[in-house]
Every structure is written in C-alpha cells, then in structure tokens.
Amino acid sequence: MSVEGIVDTNVAIVANGHAEHVGVDCQLACVQQLILIQRGQRVCIDHSGLILSEYRRYLSHSGQPGLGDAFFKWLWDNQANIYVCDQVTITPTNDGEQLFAEFPDDPALARFDPSDRKFVAVARAHPAHPPIHNAVDTDWYQYQEALAAHGVVIIQVCPDDLRRLADRQ
C-alpha cells in the first residue's frame, strides 16, 4: 500500500445507505471506493483522533450493518498499523472552532465548514498531500478550486449527485 487517501465521513455514511437524497449509483460508487481504499491505499487520519471521533458519531464500531460501518471498524482496528493507516499531526489553534495552523489562511475559504477543516489540515500536513474523498458534501464541491490553489485535491466520488445538490442551493 503506497498511495494515501483521506476519507470524509459522508462517503461511509452514503455507503451505508443513509443518504436518501442520492441515488443507488452514488451508494454503489461509495461502496466501491471504500473497497478500493481498503485494498490498495493507506488511509490518513489525524494523530489526535478527531477524524476517528467524527466517524464514531456516525458509524458503528461493530462494523455492521453497512459497508461504511465495516470500513470504520477496519480503520479503527488498523489505526496503529503503519501499512494501513498514516497518522498525521495537525495543530489546533483554538479549542472551540476547529481551526488548525495547517488550514489555509485564505479569505476564499473563510466560510468553509469548520467541521471539515481537520481533513484539509491532514492533507496539507502530510508530505504526500493525499486527496480527500467526498461523496455528497457540497462544501467540497463549492470550495474545490480554492482548496486546489493550496494543494488540496478532492476526489468527487458522486459527481453527478453532487452537482445536482449544489445546484439546488
């Protein structure tokens, strides 16, 4: 496993079938993406456990009943396995607003979802600048160019559903 990647929580949620606003094709794409990641990539998370804590709020530790839950259990069980998981140190700059030194200081990103900033911080702190996988979170779509200007690559797993959702806003 040599390729690294970061997985936004919404990919696993959609894989579980808990996103009624998307089609079955998107759910299948998320399932396939998680399987590909498990078979051939190292997953990047933060050393302090913020990403795993977010997963824990939305996914089951038991690994059931969905494939997103199975991904979470696999990652949880392998978080210390350097061949599967790469833990990256990120630097919080305050306690309550989820701000990180690694997040770009850019007015174009001022309204970017604070709860997703940890993923960006991990991508920028990691030496390989791994891509972030997104299913249907429109922030990743709306801010894709601004993030790219700072070296953050977003892989849109469900581009058609995402465009449709973004057009509704």
Predicted feature residues:
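Active-site neighborhoods of divalent-metal-dependent phosphate/nucleic-acid chemistry enzymes
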Residues: V84-I132
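Well-ordered, non-membrane alpha-helical segments in soluble/globular domains
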Residues: H21-Q32, P65-W74, W140
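PIN-domain endoribonuclease scaffold, especially VapC-family toxins
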Residues: L36-Q41, G49-L99
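Short His-Asn-centered micro-motif
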Residues: V7-T9, I45-G49, F112-S115, H133-T138
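Short amphipathic alpha-helical segments and helix-helix/interface helices
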Residues: V31-I35, F72, V120, R124
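Acidic, PIN/NYN-like endoribonuclease modules and their adjacent C-terminal/linker elements
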Residues: S2, H47-S48, V120, R124-Q169
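Short, well-structured N-terminal submotif of metal-dependent ribonuclease cores
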Residues: M1-H47
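A short acidic (Asp/Glu
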Residues: A15-H18, E54-L59, Y143-A146
